[in-house]
């Protein structure tokens, strides 16, 4: 059973009527983060410009009170990420939370990976959201179908890759770090799965950090635990 914590304000910052970034920690949902901030800073309204999965970290762009009306535009901004992908394995959730569903011993070579990523720059990409996601089909969230072992047709979604670059690749562990600059609605988990398949292999997302949303950058964001202190 997960330990429940209380929080206290760490600062006397005024976060009312503001747009600001929070460095979301791992194992917190995006909604958990903003609801904690809302409660302990006495805010009337709060929202964010794009969900990060609980396992992801990085820039959660937040708007409060009167500024929440700007979220509809902020959500449309391009986003930049650093993703760590593990090849040779496929999982049910396309990330480290799921069960391993496929495995191969085939090795990916750095040159092949570089060529594939270069090919994907400035291209439209058709992807299916992960079955374990909050996307709604016929009024029901995809993860609800998955948990009930119910099959459902998941439509492909047209998204855009502005730029994708190889940061590093380890040929022994078959792990890679890539940077991605993508349009709204882009699922990095689906990308990890798809890039594995495109390379005649498998892949899943090990770690993800969002570093930019439009003109807002992670290095300008508040650390979550600088805003609130966790107490038993």
Swiss-Prot record:
Its EC number is 5.4.99.25. InterPro entries: PsdUridine_synth_cat_dom_sf, PsdUridine_synth_N, tRNA_psdUridine_synth_TruB. GO terms for molecular function: RNA binding; tRNA pseudouridine(55) synthase activity. The active site is at residue 53. It holds the Pfam family TruB_N. GO terms for biological process: mRNA pseudouridine synthesis; tRNA pseudouridine synthesis. It catalyses: uridine(55) in tRNA = pseudouridine(55) in tRNA. Keywords: Isomerase, tRNA processing. Responsible for synthesis of pseudouridine from uracil-55 in the psi GC loop of transfer RNAs. Belongs to the pseudouridine synthase TruB family. Type 1 subfamily. This is tRNA pseudouridine synthase B. It comes from Malacoplasma penetrans (strain HF-2) (Mycoplasma penetrans). The gene is truB.
């Amino acid at each position: 059973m997960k330990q429940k914590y209380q929080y206290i304000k760490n600062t006397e910052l005024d976060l009312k009527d503001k747009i600001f970034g929070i460095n979301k920690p791992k194992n917190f949902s995006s909604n958990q983060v903003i609801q904690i901030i809302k409660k302990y800073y006495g805010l009337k309204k709060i929202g964010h410009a794009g969900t990060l999965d609980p396992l992801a970290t990085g820039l959660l762009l937040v708007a409060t009170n009167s500024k929440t009306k700007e979220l509809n535009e902020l959500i449309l901004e391009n986003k930049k990420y650093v993703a760590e992908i593990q090849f040779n394995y496929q999982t049910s959730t396309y990330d480290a939370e799921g069960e391993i569903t496929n495995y191969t011993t085939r090795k990916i070579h750095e040159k092949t990976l570089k060529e594939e990523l270069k090919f994907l720059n400035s291209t439209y990409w058709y992807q299916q959201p992960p079955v374990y996601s909050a996307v709604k089909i016929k009024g029901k969230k995809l993860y609800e179908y998955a948990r009930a072992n119910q099959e459902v047709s998941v439509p492909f979604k047209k998204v855009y890759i502005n730029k994708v670059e190889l940061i590093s690749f380890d040929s022994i562990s078959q792990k890679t770090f890539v940077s991605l600059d993508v349009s709204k609605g882009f699922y990095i988990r689906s990308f990890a799965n798809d890039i594995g398949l495109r390379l005649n292999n498998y892949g899943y997302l090990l770690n993800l950090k969002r570093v930019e949303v439009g003109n807002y950058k992670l290095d300008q964001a508040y650390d979550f635990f600088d805003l609130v202190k966790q107490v038993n």
